[in-house]
Protein backbone atom coordinates (compact mmCIF):
# COMPACT_ATOMS: atom_id res chain seq x y z
CA UNK A 1 0.00 0.00 0.00
CA UNK A 2 1.45 3.35 -1.09
CA UNK A 3 0.37 6.98 -0.72
CA UNK A 4 1.69 10.36 -1.81
CA UNK A 5 1.91 13.24 0.66
CA UNK A 6 1.45 16.69 -0.86
CA UNK A 7 1.80 20.13 0.64
CA UNK A 8 0.97 23.66 -0.53
CA UNK A 9 4.16 25.72 -0.34
CA UNK A 10 5.76 28.89 -1.70
CA UNK A 11 2.99 30.96 -0.15
CA UNK A 12 5.18 33.71 1.27
CA UNK A 13 5.22 37.13 -0.38
CA UNK A 14 8.09 39.61 -0.28
CA UNK A 15 9.24 40.02 3.32
CA UNK A 16 6.09 38.33 4.62
CA UNK A 17 6.67 34.68 5.46
CA UNK A 18 4.12 31.86 5.50
CA UNK A 19 4.89 28.43 6.91
CA UNK A 20 8.11 26.47 7.24
CA UNK A 21 8.74 25.38 3.67
CA UNK A 22 12.21 23.95 4.31
CA UNK A 23 10.90 21.59 6.98
CA UNK A 24 7.70 20.63 5.15
CA UNK A 25 9.48 19.83 1.90
CA UNK A 26 11.53 17.17 3.70
CA UNK A 27 8.30 15.45 4.75
CA UNK A 28 6.33 15.65 1.49
CA UNK A 29 6.70 13.69 -1.75
CA UNK A 30 5.04 16.34 -3.92
CA UNK A 31 4.46 20.05 -3.44
CA UNK A 32 2.08 22.59 -4.93
CA UNK A 33 3.65 26.00 -5.42
CA UNK A 34 1.74 29.29 -5.34
CA UNK A 35 2.10 31.19 -8.61
CA UNK A 36 1.75 34.83 -7.57
CA UNK A 37 -2.02 35.36 -7.60
CA UNK A 38 -3.16 34.24 -4.14
CA UNK A 39 0.39 34.19 -2.73
CA UNK A 40 3.99 33.88 -3.80
CA UNK A 41 6.18 35.95 -6.07
CA UNK A 42 8.98 35.26 -8.54
CA UNK A 43 11.70 35.03 -5.89
CA UNK A 44 9.61 32.86 -3.57
CA UNK A 45 8.70 30.57 -6.45
CA UNK A 46 12.36 30.16 -7.44
CA UNK A 47 13.44 29.48 -3.87
CA UNK A 48 10.72 26.85 -3.45
CA UNK A 49 11.53 25.15 -6.76
CA UNK A 50 15.22 25.06 -5.80
CA UNK A 51 14.33 23.43 -2.47
CA UNK A 52 12.16 20.84 -4.20
CA UNK A 53 14.81 20.00 -6.76
CA UNK A 54 17.46 19.57 -4.08
CA UNK A 55 15.18 17.16 -2.17
CA UNK A 56 13.98 15.28 -5.26
CA UNK A 57 10.38 16.33 -4.68
CA UNK A 58 7.83 16.68 -7.50
CA UNK A 59 6.43 20.17 -8.08
CA UNK A 60 3.07 21.38 -9.31
CA UNK A 61 1.38 24.68 -10.02
CA UNK A 62 -1.11 25.87 -7.40
CA UNK A 63 -3.21 28.50 -9.23
CA UNK A 64 -5.81 30.57 -7.44
CA UNK A 65 -7.90 33.69 -7.84
CA UNK A 66 -6.06 37.02 -7.98
CA UNK A 67 -6.59 37.77 -4.28
CA UNK A 68 -3.42 38.45 -2.31
CA UNK A 69 -5.26 40.20 0.51
CA UNK A 70 -7.62 37.27 1.00
CA UNK A 71 -5.04 34.54 0.33
CA UNK A 72 -7.22 33.29 -2.52
CA UNK A 73 -9.91 32.13 -0.13
CA UNK A 74 -12.52 34.65 -1.28
CA UNK A 75 -14.70 33.87 -4.32
CA UNK A 76 -14.25 36.05 -7.41
CA UNK A 77 -17.60 36.16 -9.20
CA UNK A 78 -18.49 36.97 -12.78
CA UNK A 79 -15.47 35.50 -14.55
CA UNK A 80 -16.18 33.88 -17.90
CA UNK A 81 -14.92 30.45 -18.86
CA UNK A 82 -12.20 31.97 -21.05
CA UNK A 83 -11.12 34.34 -18.27
CA UNK A 84 -10.80 31.41 -15.89
CA UNK A 85 -8.83 29.41 -18.43
CA UNK A 86 -6.46 32.34 -19.00
CA UNK A 87 -6.05 32.87 -15.25
CA UNK A 88 -5.04 29.24 -14.71
CA UNK A 89 -2.85 28.99 -17.83
CA UNK A 90 -0.99 32.18 -16.88
CA UNK A 91 -0.05 30.79 -13.48
CA UNK A 92 0.98 27.38 -14.80
CA UNK A 93 3.21 29.08 -17.36
CA UNK A 94 4.83 31.25 -14.71
CA UNK A 95 5.87 28.24 -12.66
CA UNK A 96 7.01 26.36 -15.76
CA UNK A 97 9.36 29.23 -16.63
CA UNK A 98 10.81 29.34 -13.11
CA UNK A 99 11.17 25.54 -13.08
CA UNK A 100 13.02 25.62 -16.40
CA UNK A 101 15.47 28.15 -14.95
CA UNK A 102 16.05 25.83 -11.99
CA UNK A 103 16.39 22.69 -14.09
CA UNK A 104 13.23 21.15 -12.64
CA UNK A 105 9.91 20.16 -14.22
CA UNK A 106 6.28 20.93 -13.35
CA UNK A 107 4.41 17.62 -13.15
CA UNK A 108 0.93 18.52 -11.91
CA UNK A 109 -1.66 21.22 -11.22
CA UNK A 110 -3.85 21.64 -8.16
CA UNK A 111 -6.28 24.55 -7.82
CA UNK A 112 -6.15 26.63 -4.64
CA UNK A 113 -8.68 27.88 -2.14
CA UNK A 114 -11.89 29.44 -3.41
CA UNK A 115 -11.07 28.53 -7.01
CA UNK A 116 -10.91 24.87 -6.05
CA UNK A 117 -13.91 25.03 -3.72
CA UNK A 118 -16.11 26.57 -6.40
CA UNK A 119 -14.86 24.16 -9.07
CA UNK A 120 -15.79 21.22 -6.86
CA UNK A 121 -19.47 22.18 -7.24
CA UNK A 122 -19.54 24.20 -10.47
CA UNK A 123 -19.12 22.44 -13.81
CA UNK A 124 -18.09 25.55 -15.75
CA UNK A 125 -15.27 26.40 -13.36
CA UNK A 126 -14.12 22.80 -13.21
CA UNK A 127 -14.09 22.52 -17.01
CA UNK A 128 -12.19 25.81 -17.35
CA UNK A 129 -9.41 24.60 -15.05
CA UNK A 130 -9.18 21.27 -16.86
CA UNK A 131 -9.21 22.97 -20.27
CA UNK A 132 -6.37 25.29 -19.27
CA UNK A 133 -4.28 22.35 -18.10
CA UNK A 134 -4.85 20.41 -21.32
CA UNK A 135 -4.09 23.46 -23.47
CA UNK A 136 -0.81 24.21 -21.69
CA UNK A 137 0.42 20.61 -21.40
CA UNK A 138 -1.88 17.57 -21.67
CA UNK A 139 0.74 15.49 -19.86
CA UNK A 140 0.29 17.49 -16.65
CA UNK A 141 -1.46 15.53 -13.91
CA UNK A 142 -4.68 17.08 -12.58
CA UNK A 143 -4.91 16.84 -8.77
CA UNK A 144 -8.61 16.72 -7.92
CA UNK A 145 -10.66 16.60 -4.74
CA UNK A 146 -12.01 13.06 -4.56
CA UNK A 147 -15.75 12.75 -5.40
CA UNK A 148 -15.98 16.33 -6.75
CA UNK A 149 -16.99 17.86 -10.11
CA UNK A 150 -13.30 18.20 -10.90
CA UNK A 151 -13.16 14.45 -11.51
CA UNK A 152 -15.72 14.54 -14.34
CA UNK A 153 -14.04 17.60 -15.86
CA UNK A 154 -10.69 15.84 -15.97
CA UNK A 155 -12.17 12.62 -17.32
CA UNK A 156 -13.98 14.46 -20.12
CA UNK A 157 -10.68 15.84 -21.41
CA UNK A 158 -8.68 12.67 -20.90
CA UNK A 159 -6.36 14.13 -18.28
CA UNK A 160 -4.37 11.94 -15.92
CA UNK A 161 -5.75 12.54 -12.45
CA UNK A 162 -4.73 12.06 -8.86
CA UNK A 163 -7.53 11.94 -6.29
CA UNK A 164 -6.83 13.93 -3.14
CA UNK A 165 -8.01 13.76 0.45
CA UNK A 166 -7.09 16.14 3.25
CA UNK A 167 -5.37 15.23 6.49
CA UNK A 168 -6.17 18.43 8.34
CA UNK A 169 -9.69 19.23 7.12
CA UNK A 170 -13.12 17.98 8.17
CA UNK A 171 -15.64 16.69 5.63
CA UNK A 172 -19.35 17.31 5.18
CA UNK A 173 -21.75 14.41 4.62
CA UNK A 174 -21.68 15.01 0.85
CA UNK A 175 -17.90 14.62 0.69
CA UNK A 176 -17.15 18.34 0.41
CA UNK A 177 -14.80 20.12 2.79
CA UNK A 178 -16.33 21.84 5.81
CA UNK A 179 -16.13 25.60 5.31
CA UNK A 180 -13.27 27.24 7.17
CA UNK A 181 -15.87 29.59 8.65
CA UNK A 182 -17.36 26.70 10.64
CA UNK A 183 -15.99 25.39 13.95
CA UNK A 184 -14.02 22.19 13.57
CA UNK A 185 -13.24 22.73 9.89
CA UNK A 186 -9.46 22.64 10.41
CA UNK A 187 -7.93 19.87 12.52
CA UNK A 188 -4.87 20.45 14.71
CA UNK A 189 -4.18 17.38 16.91
CA UNK A 190 -1.17 15.80 15.19
CA UNK A 191 -1.56 12.30 16.62
CA UNK A 192 -5.31 12.21 16.02
CA UNK A 193 -4.82 13.41 12.44
CA UNK A 194 -2.17 10.75 11.82
CA UNK A 195 -4.39 7.92 13.06
CA UNK A 196 -7.36 9.30 11.10
CA UNK A 197 -5.37 9.29 7.86
CA UNK A 198 -4.10 5.75 8.43
CA UNK A 199 -7.70 4.56 8.83
CA UNK A 200 -8.75 6.50 5.74
CA UNK A 201 -6.07 4.87 3.60
CA UNK A 202 -6.66 1.37 4.98
CA UNK A 203 -10.44 1.54 4.53
CA UNK A 204 -10.74 3.79 1.47
CA UNK A 205 -13.28 5.77 3.44
CA UNK A 206 -13.56 9.21 5.03
CA UNK A 207 -15.68 9.84 8.11
CA UNK A 208 -17.65 13.10 7.92
CA UNK A 209 -18.06 15.65 10.69
CA UNK A 210 -21.36 13.97 11.66
CA UNK A 211 -19.93 10.44 11.57
CA UNK A 212 -21.13 9.40 8.12
CA UNK A 213 -18.82 7.06 6.19
CA UNK A 214 -17.99 8.13 2.61
CA UNK A 215 -16.19 5.95 0.08
CA UNK A 216 -13.35 7.82 -1.64
CA UNK A 217 -10.48 7.01 -3.94
CA UNK A 218 -7.30 8.46 -2.47
CA UNK A 219 -3.95 8.71 -4.24
CA UNK A 220 -2.53 11.64 -2.29
CA UNK A 221 -3.03 13.21 1.12
CA UNK A 222 -2.67 16.97 1.59
CA UNK A 223 -1.25 18.71 4.62
CA UNK A 224 -1.64 22.49 4.44
CA UNK A 225 1.68 24.22 5.01
CA UNK A 226 -0.09 27.21 6.57
CA UNK A 227 -1.93 25.14 9.20
CA UNK A 228 -0.52 25.87 12.69
CA UNK A 229 1.61 22.91 13.71
CA UNK A 230 1.91 21.67 10.12
CA UNK A 231 5.43 20.31 10.61
CA UNK A 232 4.39 18.35 13.71
CA UNK A 233 1.35 17.00 11.86
CA UNK A 234 3.48 15.88 8.92
CA UNK A 235 6.04 14.20 11.17
CA UNK A 236 3.35 12.37 13.13
CA UNK A 237 1.73 11.25 9.90
CA UNK A 238 4.97 9.97 8.37
CA UNK A 239 5.64 7.95 11.53
CA UNK A 240 2.12 6.53 11.66
CA UNK A 241 2.25 5.51 8.01
CA UNK A 242 5.59 3.77 8.50
CA UNK A 243 4.36 2.01 11.65
CA UNK A 244 1.36 0.69 9.72
CA UNK A 245 3.32 -0.52 6.69
CA UNK A 246 2.09 2.20 4.33
CA UNK A 247 4.82 3.39 1.98
CA UNK A 248 5.14 7.06 1.02
CA UNK A 249 6.08 7.82 -2.59
CA UNK A 250 5.30 10.38 -5.32
CA UNK A 251 1.81 9.92 -6.71
CA UNK A 252 3.03 8.53 -10.02
CA UNK A 253 3.66 5.29 -8.12
CA UNK A 254 0.70 5.58 -5.74
CA UNK A 255 -1.98 2.88 -6.03
From Swiss-Prot:
GO process terms (BP): carbohydrate metabolic process
Molecular function via GO: 5-oxoprolinase (ATP-hydrolyzing) activity; ATP binding
Catalytic activity reported: 5-oxo-L-proline + ATP + 2 H2O = L-glutamate + ADP + phosphate + H(+)
InterPro entries: Glyco_hydro/deAcase_b/a-brl, LamB/YcsF/PxpA-like
Keywords, alphabetical: ATP-binding, Hydrolase, Nucleotide-binding
Pfam families documented for this protein: LamB_YcsF (PF03746)
SUPFAM superfamilies recorded: Glycoside hydrolase/deacetylase (SSF88713)
Role: Catalyzes the cleavage of 5-oxoproline to form L-glutamate coupled to the hydrolysis of ATP to ADP and inorganic phosphate.
Family statement: Belongs to the LamB/PxpA family.
Protein name: 5-oxoprolinase subunit A
Organism in which the protein naturally occurs: Nitrobacter hamburgensis (strain DSM 10229 / NCIMB 13809 / X14)
Amino acid sequence: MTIDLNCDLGESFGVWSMGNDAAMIDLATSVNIACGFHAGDADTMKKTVDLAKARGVSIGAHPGYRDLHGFGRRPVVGLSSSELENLVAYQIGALQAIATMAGHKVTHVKAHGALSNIACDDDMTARAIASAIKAVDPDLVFVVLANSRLVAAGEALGLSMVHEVFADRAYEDDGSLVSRRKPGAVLHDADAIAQRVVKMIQSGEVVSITGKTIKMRMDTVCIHGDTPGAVEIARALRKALKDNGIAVAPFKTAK
